[in-house]
């Protein structure tokens, strides 16, 4: 009789690491976690450090930290000075030369937070893709999350790369983002840009669809008893459907004369509207980075210049944009030492 003794195949370090990363634990790590967790930690830590201690005096001539008296709405990690160009401002680079204090003064925390934040968001998207594959579902969550990533990358990275320096990127703070919005309007007439319109339609349309869908499901929950509440419908172990798609279809058919006939098309539409809107707005921001113009109704501007009694909402907005540029530029870019004489400041046709 012959006895064959089997030997377990040897496992390499990659297999061991793969098993450890994908082990079932309270917080899943995975291969995506190698990118996500360090980058998210460093981005958040850099932002908290900057908003707590670091001034923007040397980059924007502003106070921007809790230490200087700013509050949650006015603190920011500000973008570097215009003179820094598109330098990555590495701590060990020629600008800071390993001096941490000088690095903070030059605005080194901004590219640190921006790049680690971008890679952290990408890591989170890859995390959704990885877990979806392990669980055995489609990766549409990752696809949906690509939309805010596209907006972040286009606004914080692509736009300033198309301009003269990182200075023109938004700083990381609430009031700083508002300043950036005013800048986009004044210098690019962003609200009249069709890509911005598609973005607004996507975000508000997605919110509307979400509200309508949630209300419709609540309205058509199957009744569990005589009571007014139907909380047993939230039991995750129930085998039957929670709500009636047929009843919902009948309701909206009576409201609009048309309704979604199946859940797949309904939920795909809820995915498509906001994701497409955000992607289109990201494309529009890349266009602004290249200083592309959108709608210019020159005929209206020429007629308004010739006829003091002719003015449209478009020509009024053009005057407002001129005002933003004229009054914002000296405050926003003090290093340029702009001086605008009174006669070139914008005046409305009625003045």
From Swiss-Prot:
Keywords: Chlorophyll, Chromophore, Electron transport, Iron, Magnesium, Membrane, Metal-binding, Oxidoreductase, Photosynthesis, Photosystem II, Thylakoid, Transmembrane, Transmembrane helix, Transport. A plastoquinone binds at residues 213, 260. One of its GO terms (molecular function) is iron ion binding. GO terms for biological process: photosynthetic electron transport in photosystem II. It is a multi-pass membrane protein. It comes from the Bacteria. It is an enzyme of class 1 (oxidoreductase). Its EC number is 1.10.3.9. GO terms for cellular component: photosystem II; plasma membrane-derived thylakoid membrane. The D1/D2 heterodimer binds P680, chlorophylls that are the primary electron donor of PSII, and subsequent electron acceptors. It shares a non-heme iron and each subunit binds pheophytin, quinone, additional chlorophylls, carotenoids and lipids. There is also a Cl(-1) ion associated with D1 and D2, which is required for oxygen evolution. The PSII complex binds additional chlorophylls, carotenoids and specific lipids. Fe cation binds at residues 213, 267. The chain crosses the membrane at residues 39-59, 123-139, 151-164, 206-226, 277-293. PANTHER family: PHOTOSYSTEM II D2 PROTEIN, PHOTOSYSTEM II PROTEIN D1. Photosystem II (PSII) is a light-driven water:plastoquinone oxidoreductase that uses light energy to abstract electrons from H(2)O, generating O(2) and a proton gradient subsequently used for ATP formation. It consists of a core antenna complex that captures photons, and an electron transfer chain that converts photonic excitation into a charge separation. The D1/D2 (PsbA/PsbD) reaction center heterodimer binds P680, the primary electron donor of PSII as well as several subsequent electron acceptors. D2 is needed for assembly of a stable PSII complex. This is Photosystem II D2 protein. It comes from Trichormus variabilis (strain ATCC 29413 / PCC 7937) (Anabaena variabilis).
């Amino acid at each position: 009789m012959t006895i064959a003794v089997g030997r377990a195949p040897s496992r390499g370090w990659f297999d061991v690491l793969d098993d450890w990363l994908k082990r079932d634990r309270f917080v899943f790590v995975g291969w995506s976690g190698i990118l996500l967790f360090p980058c998210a930690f460093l981005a958040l830590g850099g932002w908290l450090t900057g908003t707590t201690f670091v001034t923007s005096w040397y980059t924007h001539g502003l106070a921007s930290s809790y230490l200087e008296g700013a509050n949650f709405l006015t603190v920011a990690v500000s973008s570097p000075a215009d003179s820094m160009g598109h330098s990555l401002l590495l701590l060990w680079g020629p600008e800071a030369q390993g001096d941490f204090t000088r690095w903070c003064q030059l605005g080194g925390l901004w590219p640190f937070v921006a790049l680690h934040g971008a890679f952290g968001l990408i890591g989170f998207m890859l995390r959704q893709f990885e877990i979806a594959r392990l669980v055995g579902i489609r990766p549409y969550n990752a696809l949906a999350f690509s939309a805010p990533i596209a907006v972040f990358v286009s606004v914080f990275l692509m736009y300033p790369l198309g301009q003269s320096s990182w200075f023109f990127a938004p700083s990381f703070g609430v009031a700083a983002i508002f300043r950036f919005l005013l800048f986009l309007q004044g210098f690019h007439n962003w609200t009249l840009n069709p890509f911005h319109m598609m973005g607004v339609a996507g975000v508000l349309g997605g919110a509307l669809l979400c509200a309508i869908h949630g209300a419709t499901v609540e309205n058509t929950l199957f009744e569990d008893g005589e009571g007014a509440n139907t909380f047993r419908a939230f039991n995750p172990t129930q085998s039957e459907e929670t709500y009636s798609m047929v009843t919902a279809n009948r309701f909206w058919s009576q409201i609009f004369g048309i309704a979604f006939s199946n859940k797949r098309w309904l939920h795909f539409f809820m995915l498509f509207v906001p994701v497409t809107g955000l992607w289109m707005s990201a494309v529009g921001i890349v266009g602004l980075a290249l200083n592309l113009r959108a709608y210019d109704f020159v005929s209206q501007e020429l007629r308004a210049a010739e006829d003091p009694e002719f003015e449209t909402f478009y020509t009024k907005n053009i005057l407002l944009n001129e005002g933003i540029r004229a009054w914002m530029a000296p405050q926003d870019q003090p290093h340029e030492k702009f001086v605008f004489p009174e006669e070139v400041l914008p005046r409305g046709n009625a003045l």
